[in-house]
């Protein structure tokens, strides 16, 4: 079992079998992704041109290749085959704000496990896999390739950045990367017809992110995995609570009214975040890090 604050490569490898029980990612295909005459019910981007052959009685005249027919002076039609694999691109947040937890595991560890489970799901499906793992100062990008070629290196990236955020705590990086930065850097690697999973707490979701997510949505399906700790639901009604963020520390007393204020504030923020993403056409999955991750993913991704 992996540590509560960092993952091991072995623990991510052991998730392969569990990934089989995750429901396939969304299969809707945007109209711009179609390459053929019909929408495929399987994963993929429609129909790809395969070859030409002579026209035979009963063939669909819509498949006529008029250039070849004119050149050869006999009727020829275009044959297509169905592309059944689909690019899967995973963006994994391993920045300092993800290094938080009150019990079980940090958000950074949960994000690492979610990414590994989804990567293994793509491996079982034979989908091309790509990804981006980012910390506060740098990042690793991998273009979509056959899963056997990408998966080992992607898991290494996850482990490296997961350990880096744990090792760096509590030091803060100047001018850390933003979620908008990573969406921008990843955009050129994401092709039409892709399924994109963004695994983050989305604490810095802003107008730049909105524009970039809208651009990504025009290329394919997006699922957001919002990792969160459920501390706000477990606060006592009395006592002292200490908090630290970005170098600032504070201690305040809890009361029933103060507790209700905190619960309302956090709940409202999460609801606004979900509404904002949903308006962009992003499927939102709120993942509580203190609960069983696999069961939450089995509800649908």
Model-derived features: where do they sit?
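Exposed, interaction-prone extracellular/peripheral surfaces
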Residues: 1-41, 54-59, 68, 77-113, ...
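Active-site SXXK
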Residues: 118
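A positional/architectural concept
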Residues: 43-46
